Amino acid sequence: MEILGGPHFAVAGAGESHGPAVTTIIHGSPPGFRIRRCDVQPFLDRRRPGGNKHGTPRNEKDKVVFLAGLYRDDTDALLTGSKLTVDVDDQSFETEGYEDGFTTGEPIAAIVLSTSKKSGDYTQFSGPTGEVRPGHTDLVKFHQSKGFVDVRGGGRSSYRSTITDVIGGSVARIILRECFGTRFVSSICQVGSLKSKQSLADTLTIDNIDEIETSLGEAEIASIDHEFANEAGELIKETRKRGNSLGAAVEVVAVGVPPLLGQPLYQSLKVRLMGALGGLNAVQSCEIGSGVDVIPRTGSENNDPIRSSGYQSNTHGGLLGGITTGSPLVARVGFKPTSTINLPQDSVNKRLDEIEFELAKGRHDPCVGVRAGVTLESRMAIELLNSVLAYQATAHCGDSIKLF
């Protein structure tokens, strides 16, 4: 079974790129936290295709409807808002979704409909003579499933599946912010060979986070380095015109992180975070803290000084021995160039006959890192909340999560 997070807080999903909808089930949410649809929707808006001129031309509205796991005695407030209509056997059925309620501790269910599909664009890849796109899962998934695979838009392997990540992560970050003041922010720090001259981790504080979030939310390229963002936007535009694609790197930071979370070895929070972030579609690398920059340093240069007030620097990225220190969690995630390009390439069909492949039709992102930040934030939030609940499950009564 594929789940994100777990065992204490976990998210599961279903749905293909060109299926009717993407569904989400959230397990382990503690009771008593207020979840409003209007607080979750902005995170999906950041993720959705068509919301950024540098992304895919596919334009989905991605409006979420909550179906289970929320309640309040004021049922007008609970139900007033979203509706779901289904036509079956020449009959129409309508029901309300949950708009504003409190978690009950039961599984939370949500659905997002898929309404902007051009499935005819993918006949090129159908059946045993279907062509294989280099860099995609076409070949391995076809043979793994004995040919029973949905080729439209990548099927279940599509980035559309991350709707589930963002819904689950939205609930996790609402709970973490209410309990600890934890906040999550991301900034694009590299596109192709262009690199940002500013680091989010070096800039972000609890005091300036609202200003930075507003600035990032208004930008086409969500980077704190505006000069870099403008140059990156032009580079993406020119690369798309040439039918090619670009890689990217995204810095993800969480502030207000409780200390003492995680395990030291096989379930360390470092292992889990690197797995969650590194397992996202198209990710090729994941670094914690200063990452590979620590390699040429000496120990005296790299160790973070400690005083009674806490750590004086954060080379360790908020994790030591897989356990949080209370310093900001810092990760840098690298994405490969989008595999779908409009240029001739050597490939095969699914019977392994050699061909010269050229894309007939399709819609895709020229740089997948552009809208990946919110998904990375969401995955970090899910793993962090799972670690909080794991800590609380083994803590002595009355223990608070405190180090300094």
UniProtKB/Swiss-Prot annotation:
A cellular-component GO term for this protein: cytosol
UniProt catalytic activity? 5-O-(1-carboxyvinyl)-3-phosphoshikimate = chorismate + phosphate
| Amino-acid positions noted as binding FMN in the UniProt annotation, renumbered to this chain | 156-158, 281-282, 321, 336-340, 363
GO terms (BP aspect): amino acid biosynthetic process; aromatic amino acid family biosynthetic process; chorismate biosynthetic process
Alphabetically ordered keywords of this record: Amino-acid biosynthesis, Aromatic amino acid biosynthesis, FAD, Flavoprotein, FMN, Lyase, NADP
Q: Which cysteines are joined by disulfide bonds?
A: none
Cofactor descriptive note: Reduced FMN (FMNH(2)).
Which residues of this UniProt protein bind NADP(+)?
A: 47
Enzyme class, spelled out: lyase
Q: GO molecular function terms here? A: chorismate synthase activity; FMN binding
Record pathway: Metabolic intermediate biosynthesis; chorismate biosynthesis; chorismate from D-erythrose 4-phosphate and phosphoenolpyruvate: step 7/7
Q: What is its EC number?
A: 4.2.3.5
InterPro entries hit by this protein = Chorismate_synth, Chorismate_synth_AroC_sf
According to the record, the signal peptide region is none
- Which cofactor does the UniProt annotation name? FMNH2
Q: Which PANTHER family match?
A: CHORISMATE SYNTHASE (PTHR21085:SF0)
Q: Please give the family membership noted in the entry.
A: Belongs to the chorismate synthase family.
What does the subunit comment say?
Homotetramer.
This chain's function reads: This reaction introduces a second double bond into the aromatic ring system.
User: Which protein, by its recorded name, is this?
Assistant: Chorismate synthase
Q: Give the organism, scientific name.
A: Rhodopirellula baltica (strain DSM 10527 / NCIMB 13988 / SH1)
